[in-house]
């Protein structure tokens, strides 16, 4: 579901509904599957489990008007990483896919495809192959990853990494030039296309 609204206009109900459906909706079945696989493993039975979650470029890159949806989908990406660390010992992989496609949920978010070729390019069919592969035995060594999939690209969305650093600073009045120096070395945020420096908000370098 979507309940798009600018943050200043968003109601608590709109926030709760989206978080509940997407983030809690990911947690709820996963915990039962995790407990089952854990018990199977402890009983000495072979386990070759897969969890494939659905994240979004709105969550991993950010999109205006979707603080609720983006937060839920970013939470799913983090959930995927942490669950992969917990469940790997039982023989379970946990990955996520951030799909970009024309669906009933997204068809009113932008201009409709003008040609059959454009509609084909935005088809959900480009999402299915990576989901199928992640569910297969071939993907056994891949876990804790978020894959972006669309008619434009198949990519691995790389998570947070530590960027430029400084020694700890006790006096906040001295932070200005230190942060400015770190910002000059930092990568610019990616926009919805996943490329560095395409984030719409101006970023100081």
Predicted feature descriptions by range:
Residues 35, 85-89, 114:
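Alpha-helical segment proximal to the catalytic Tyr-Lys
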Residues 41, 61, 77, 82-92, ...:
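Active-site-adjacent segment of SDR/Rossmann-fold oxidoreductases
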Residues 56:
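Residue(s) in the substrate-gating loop at a strand-loop-helix junction
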Residues 59-62, 67-75:
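The catalytic Tyr-X3-Lys active-site helix of short-chain dehydrogenase/reductase
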């Amino acid at each position: 579901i979507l309940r798009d609204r600018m943050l200043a206009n968003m109601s608590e109900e709109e926030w709760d509904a989206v978080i509940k459906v997407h983030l809690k909706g990911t947690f709820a079945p996963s915990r039962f599957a995790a407990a089952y696989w854990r018990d199977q493993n402890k009983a000495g039975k072979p386990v070759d489990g897969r969890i494939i979650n659905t994240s979004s470029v709105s969550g991993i890159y950010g999109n205006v008007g979707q603080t609720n949806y983006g937060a839920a989908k970013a939470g799913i990406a983090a959930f995927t990483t942490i669950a992969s660390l917990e469940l790997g010992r039982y023989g379970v992989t946990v990955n996520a896919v951030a799909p970009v496609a024309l669906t009933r949920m997204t068809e009113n978010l932008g201009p409709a495809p003008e040609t059959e070729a454009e509609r084909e390019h935005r088809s959900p069919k480009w999402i299915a192959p990576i989901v199928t592969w992640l569910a297969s035995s071939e993907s056994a060594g891949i876990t804790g990853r978020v894959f972006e999939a669309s008619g434009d690209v198949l990519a691995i969305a790389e998570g947070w990494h530590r960027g430029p650093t400084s020694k700890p600073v006790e006096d906040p009045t001295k932070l200005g030039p230190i942060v400015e120096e770190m910002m000059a070395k930092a990568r610019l945020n990616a926009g919805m296309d996943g490329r560095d420096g395409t984030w719409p908000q101006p970023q100081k370098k």
